[in-house]
């Protein structure tokens, strides 16, 4: 029989590979192809008609990985309702099913692994109907109308069933033998959101494979002795949202693997010393929203595996100094309590502590040694308290401190001295900081001045700064390659209140002649550019009469450096006539007078009268040989070639020119004192050769080293591969064997479901216990 079923399944899979979703089915359902079958969603359609179409096209459909029929007008499940179909997951949620026949699942028993029947009107557990599903792994009966589980409704012998969800029903009583037939396979039981007033200890006792037990949102008032007995692998117990007043230390016996314990939303009033000492593997303890008034000494000590402790929304007003001794807590939440002071050593004995929250308490003072032992602290929340000051060096030992929240306190000034130089962020919003307190950034524990940032104190408007005025700069690229004309500074005329008012016109006040230039943007100018810094002195403006008009500045001839070189080279090889034609008439002194009342552009050459030079004389060339006499009228750096004194034309008497002609001298073409060009070229060539040789040698050495490393790595990999072939084959065979075994048992993906530790969270939130949505 099994061989026939396997052949039928194999043939249907072959046909399915050619045409997975027939057109008739796609018209009524949403069909998608997966790795080993199809997924059908036939919601909002008649279930009877859909199943008839699937049976007709069973040869083409093959294995159905998931069949969903939500809101499919189902009221009951008649006998053989799914016969002839190969379905692995059946979802019949959100219908109005009240009755399930004992033979409703007949015909699909070989492959059915999961049945979802939540959000229906089922009043009893369909134990007889489930008895024909030996391969069932998961059963969801949540959000129904089950009131109690009687003896005839206990779960049948299902050796692979590991997940039962009975949450959100009306269960108040469970028979002792409810889970007796599945005690060797059951791993998760959800009985949350029911009406139980006591822990069903007799029903869950001795479940050796039970890992997660959810009893949240019931009416349990107390934990009696031996409530949780012989649960060796239980790692999650959820008792949140009940009415528990006191924790009995004898309630947990032989529960060594408990890692997550949820006790939030109860009415626990006190904790005793060493109350949780038996939980050697406890990693997370949630006591949020209880009525705990104090944490006595050693009540939470000795928990070497505890990482997260939540004590928010209680009435804690006192914490003993040794309450957390020898614990490895990383996240500690004590927000929304009644603490008024943080004494010295309040969180001592916590070397791994990283996150602490004292938000929304009544803290007024903090002892400077309160956090001395918490050297690994990273985040501290002290918001919504009544702090008026923080003593210096309070957080000096916390070198890893990144965030301190001091919002909504009563701090009149910034407590800079309380932190070390490595603090990352300090939040100070909603504090009554005094008006003289300048807030600024911190860098290495000191204030950082931000350039161009205005200081706003007591709501005073910041002083406006003058906007920079850009002065156009003439670059060399704008100068023509031809011999330019005279380059002169533009004339500048500054009028002071010279505008007269006529009629109703108001007098126009001229703006300042010069503004300061933003030097920060002009520091990267090329060396050859000119940069003018123009200032607006207010004292000078007041000294000028209203009707005075300043004399315009005379143009100044500023020949460029190229013109001077070109002119000197031309003068050396031209005749006397060309010298006369190209000579220029330059006044002996500048016309600019040192007048402090005149606003001039800066810099201006010869702002003051220059030094007096030696008197120059004219030299006339004669036919008689004579010794040339050198007059030192030029700087010593300019040499005059001997015997090449040019002749300068005599001034004409008819022209009646009052200006003087300055004699021009040809520059020396060569000198014995100057070094020749050949040694310089040889020295430059020698230096360049040395540089090229060094660079080439370095490149060759680098290439050889890289090649050697590549060859060594290749040989190492080749050597390792010679020994890894056999081990890789054995590993692949082992993985394949485990996969086949898990496929037969169906529990491979469930073993580690609750082994993963949840991510550390700063605040659990309001819906942290809604494990089943």
UniProtKB/Swiss-Prot annotation:
Tissue specificity of this protein: In L1 larvae, expressed in a subset of epithelial cells including epidermal, vulval and rectal cells and the excretory duct and pore. Absent from internal epithelia such as the gut and pharyngeal tubes. Transiently expressed in the excretory canal cell at the 1.5-fold embryonic stage but no longer visible in this cell at hatching.
Main location: membrane
GO CC annotation: apical part of cell; apical plasma membrane
GO biological processes: embryo development ending in birth or egg hatching; epithelial cell development; nematode larval development; positive regulation of membrane permeability; regulation of tube size
Null mutant phenotype: Highly lethal at L1 larval stage due to excretory defects. A small percentage of mutants die as embryos and a very small number survive to adulthood and are fertile but have defects in locomotion and egg-laying. There is no maternal effect on lethality.
Signal sequence extent: 1-20
LRR repeat windows: 61-84, 85-107, 109-132, 133-157, 159-181, 183-206, 207-230, 231-254, 256-278, 279-302, 303-326, 328-349, 350-373, 375-397, 399-421, 486-516
Keyword Chloroplast recorded: no
Disulfide bond residue pairs: none
Location relative to the cell: Apical cell membrane
InterPro entries: Leu-rich_rpt, Leu-rich_rpt_typical-subtyp, LRR_dom_sf
Descriptive protein name: Leucine-rich repeat-containing protein let-4
Species of provenance: Caenorhabditis elegans
Gene: let-4
């Amino acid at each position: 029989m099994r061989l026939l079923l396997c052949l039928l399944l194999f043939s249907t899979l072959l046909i399915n590979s050619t045409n997975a979703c027939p057109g008739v089915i796609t018209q009524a359902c949403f069909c998608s192809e997966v790795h080993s079958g199809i997924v059908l969603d036939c919601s909002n359609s008649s279930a009877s008609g859909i199943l008839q179409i699937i049976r007709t096209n069973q040869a083409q459909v093959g294995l159905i990985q998931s069949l969903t029929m939500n809101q499919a007008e189902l009221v009951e499940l008649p006998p053989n309702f799914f016969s002839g179909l190969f379905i692995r997951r059946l979802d019949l949620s959100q219908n109005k099913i009240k009755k399930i026949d004992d033979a409703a699942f007949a015909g699909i028993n070989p492959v059915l692994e999961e049945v979802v029947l939540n959000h229906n009107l089922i009043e009893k557990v369909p134990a007889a109907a489930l008895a024909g599903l030996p391969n069932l792994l998961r059963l969801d009966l949540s959000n129904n109308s089950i009131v109690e589980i009687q003896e005839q409704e206990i779960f049948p012998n299902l050796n692979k069933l590991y997940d039962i969800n009975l949450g959100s029903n009306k269960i108040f009583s469970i028979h002792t033998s409810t889970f007796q037939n599945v005690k060797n396979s059951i791993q998760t039981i959800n009985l949350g959101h029911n009406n139980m007033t006591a822990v069903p200890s007799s029903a869950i006792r001795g479940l050796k494979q039970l890992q997660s037990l959810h009893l949240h949102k019931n009416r349990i008032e107390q934990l009696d002795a031996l409530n949780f007995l012989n649960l060796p692998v239980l790692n999650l117990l959820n008792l949140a949202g009940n009415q528990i007043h006191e924790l009995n230390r004898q309630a947990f016996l032989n529960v060594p693997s408990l890692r997550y314990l949820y006790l939030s939303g109860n009415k626990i009033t006190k904790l005793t010393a060493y109350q949780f000492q038996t939980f050697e593997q406890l990693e997370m303890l949630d006591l949020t929203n209880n009525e705990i008034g104090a944490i006595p000494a050693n009540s939470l000590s000795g928990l070497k595996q505890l990482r997260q402790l939540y004590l928010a929304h209680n009435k804690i007003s006192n914490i003993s100094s040794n309450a957390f001794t020898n614990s490895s807590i990383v996240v500690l939440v004590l927000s929304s309590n009644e603490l008024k002071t943080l004494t010295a050593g309040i969180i001592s004995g916590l070397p791994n502590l990283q996150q602490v929250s004292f938000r929304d308490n009544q803290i007024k003072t903090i002892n400077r040694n309160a956090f001395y032992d918490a050297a690994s602290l990273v985040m501290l929340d002290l918001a919504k308290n009544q702090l008026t000051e923080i003593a210096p060096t309070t957080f000096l030992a916390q070198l890893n401190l990144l965030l301190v929240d001091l919002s909504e306190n009563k701090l009149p000034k910034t407590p800079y001295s309380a932190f070390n130089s490595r603090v990352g962020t300090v939040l100070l919003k909603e504090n009554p900081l005094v008006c003289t307190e300048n807030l600024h950034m911190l860098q290495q524990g000191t204030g950082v001045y931000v350039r161009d940032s205005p200081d706003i104190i007591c709501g005073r408007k910041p002083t406006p700064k003058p906007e920079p005025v850009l002065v156009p700069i003439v670059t060399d690229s704008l100068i023509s390659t031809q011999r330019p004309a005279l380059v002169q500074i533009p004339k500048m005329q500054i009028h002071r209140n010279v505008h007269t008012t006529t009629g109703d016109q108001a007098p126009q006040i001229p703006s300042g002649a010069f503004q300061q230039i933003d030097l920060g943007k002009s520091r990267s100018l090329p060396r050859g550019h000119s940069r003018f810094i123009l200032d607006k002195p207010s004292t000078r403006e007041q000294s000028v009469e209203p009707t005075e008009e300043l004399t315009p500045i005379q143009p100044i001839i500023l020949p460029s450096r190229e013109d001077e070189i070109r002119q000197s080279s031309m003068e050396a090889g031209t005749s006397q006539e060309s010298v006369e034609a190209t000579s220029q008439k330059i006044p002996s002194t500048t016309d600019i007078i040192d007048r402090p009342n005149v606003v001039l552009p800066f810099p201006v050459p010869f702002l003051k009268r220059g030094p007096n030079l030696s008197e120059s004389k004219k030299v006339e060339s004669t036919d008689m040989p004579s010794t040339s006499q050198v007059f030192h009228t030029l700087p010593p750096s300019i040499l005059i070639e001997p015997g090449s004194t040019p002749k300068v034309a005599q001034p004409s008497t008819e022209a009646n020119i009052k200006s003087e002609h300055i004699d021009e001298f040809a520059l020396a073409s060569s000198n014995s004192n100057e070094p020749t060009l050949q040694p310089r070229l040889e020295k430059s060539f020698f230096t360049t050769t040395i540089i090229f040789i060094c660079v080439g040698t370095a490149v060759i050495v680098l290439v050889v080293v890289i090649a050697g490393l590549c060859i060594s790595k290749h040989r190492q990999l080749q050597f390792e591969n010679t020994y890894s072939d056999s081990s890789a084959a054995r590993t692949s065979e082992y993985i394949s064997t485990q996969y086949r075994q898990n496929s037969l048992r169906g529990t491979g993906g469930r073993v580690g479901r609750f082994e993963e530790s949840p991510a550390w969270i700063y605040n659990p939130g309001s819906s942290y216990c809604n494990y089943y949505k």
